[in-house]
Design a protein with these regions (language model features):
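Gram-negative bacterial Sec-dependent N-terminal signal peptides
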Residues: 1-23
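Extracytoplasmic "Venus flytrap"
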Residues: 28-53, 76-83, 104, 177-186, ...
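Beta-alpha junction/loop-to-helix N-cap segments that form part of ligand/metal-binding clefts
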Residues: 28-30, 43-50, 62-135, 144, ...
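Venus flytrap/periplasmic-binding-protein-like
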Residues: 78, 122-124, 129-133, 210, ...
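Periplasmic-binding protein-like
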Residues: 92-105, 123-125, 173-178, 226-236, ...
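Extracellular/periplasmic Venus flytrap/periplasmic-binding protein
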Residues: 130-131, 139-249, 287-294
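Extracellular/periplasmic periplasmic-binding protein-like sensory domains
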Residues: 246-325, 405, 420
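Segments of small-molecule ligand-sensing domains
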Residues: 305-319, 330-404, 408
């Protein structure tokens, strides 16, 4: 994989010999990846960056790209900084990107108003603004396969299952330990609504970014408050610190559950045996026992075309999550080619491809991913799918599936998505009404 630095000082990884910017559209399908291999969030960012790039580059090496067209894969380092993320967007938007992956809720929020103007679809896979799942109001934003509100509701359903029913969680105290940033705050409205509906007490424990690795006082507050359950909405260095601090105060790990971004192997591993029993919501399988991952090893990793530093990292949770992210991109591009009859597709075409996305179990098997993730079906109205979420548990060395599928509480989530989406549009004067065409699922 060749590396180059752009004028902004951004690291670039291309799957083709480096071409002039003006020739990108003619030579291939351009896919920029916003990544963060540096800074306090790098522990989460590195495996994601590797997995996304490795799958796309595997398609180039094995298949010659998609539909006979090579993919031009380019990384832009954001450091998980919103300002840098917007700079990355400004740097790539003139290169006819098929899609933009912000990999940050803060960056996503800044790009949402720009997407329709620039005709660039935004894929915020299971992150970003939950309300953007409403495709009628956000035709350029996609956040499959589940929103943060789906995740928070799945957590509450799990709590109810363990406690013996929704009626049994009345009077319980549930704490949300969250990064004090847009990402961390995203589940709060849904949890507040569920607290009112089911009668539990919600306690909020925000963690400012500068204190991510110094949470001792917060966990002393938790020891004092004695919540019955903890939901962790952390990221980067915050996650392993939280797991270690929970163990330190003796909080029962079986009652601490992380969102799917708090389930990296390196989130639990540093706490050693004391992390045993910690659980995380999940969206994908772990391990390398899938033909697709064997192909990534064969065509990319074993040939030295990956930035991964250790082969053992292949198959870990976030690496596999990123593969799933890139599969969604690739399938949307295939759909776009099928719908339009074009080989080199634009962002406008790929938006249509996302809306026609229907990844069935049969298609997962064709992709070499049988059992890797739940099926995903999007539509013009539903840009998420709100699919089943699994729960994995750390056994001291690795993740194991504890609950294969937990359905979101859709009768609570969907009305909130619709009402919040409408509020967003009303608050943003001049928000364009949808005029984009709608295609059948493919």
């Amino acid at each position: 994989m060749r590396l180059k630095h752009l004028a902004l000082g951004l690291a670039v990884a291309t799957a083709l010999p480096v071409a002039a910017v003006t020739a990108y559209a003619e030579e291939g399908i351009y896919i920029p990846l916003f990544t963060y291999r540096t800074g306090p969030f790098a522990g989460s960012g590195i495996p994601i960056a590797n997995g996304m790039a490795d799958y796309l580059n595997m398609l180039n090496e094995r298949d010659g790209g998609i539909g006979g067209v090579k993919l031009i894969v380019e990384e832009c380092e954001t450091g998980y900084d919103t300002k840098k993320g917007v700079e990355c967007y400004d740097a790539v938007k003139g290169k006819n990107p098929a899609v933009v992956n912000p990999y940050s809720t803060g960056i996503t929020l800044q790009l949402i108003p720009k997407a329709a103007v620039d005709k660039i679809p935004i894929l915020s896979m299971a992150y970003g603004l939950s309300a953007s799942a409403d495709g009628n109001l956000f035709p350029w934003i996609f956040n499959p396969p589940a929103t943060y509100w789906d995740g928070a509701s799945a957590f509450i359903r799990h709590v109810a299952d363990v406690e013996g029913g929704f009626d049994k969680i009345k009077g319980k105290k549930i704490g949300l330990v969250h990064l004090d940033a847009p990402y961390g705050k995203e589940p709060i409205p849904l949890l507040q609504a569920l607290a009112q509906d089911y009668g539990f007490e919600l306690k909020l424990y925000p963690v400012p970014a500068p204190q991510m690795q110094n949470q001792s006082s917060l966990w002393l507050d938790i020891r004092r408050d004695k919540p019955d359950w903890i939901y962790l909405q952390g990221w980067g260095a915050m996650n392993p610190t939280a797991v270690k601090e929970a163990a330190k105060i003796g909080f029962p790990m079986s009652r601490m559950v992380g969102v799917w971004w708090s389930g990296n192997d390196d989130d639990a591993r540093p706490a050693g045996p004391e992390a045993k029993g910690y659980s995380s919501l999940d969206l994908n399988a772990v391990g390398t026992d899938f033909p697709v991952i064997q192909d990534i090893l064969k065509y990319v990793v074993d040939k030295g075309k990956s930035q991964i530093t250790s082969k053992d990292k292949v198959g870990e949770n976030f690496y596999n999550r990123a593969i799933w992210n890139s599969v969604l991109i690739a399938e949307a591009i295939r759909n776009a080619q099928k719908i339009t009859g074009k080989k080199v597709v634009s962002g406008d075409d790929v938006r249509r491809g996302f809306e026609a996305l229907d990844i069935t179990p049969a298609r997962m098997k064709e992709l070499g991913m049988e059992g890797f993730a739940a099926p995903v079906k999007l539509s013009c109205a539903d840009h998420n799918g709100h699919g089943g979420i699994s729960l994995v548990e750390w056994d001291g060395t690795k993740w194991n599936t504890k609950v294969p599928s937990i359905q979101p509480i859709k009768d609570k989530v969907l009305p909130l998505i619709n009402s919040t989406a409408e509020e967003y549009v009303k608050a943003n004067t001049g928000w364009p009404k949808r005029t984009e065409p709608c295609d059948k699922s493919s």
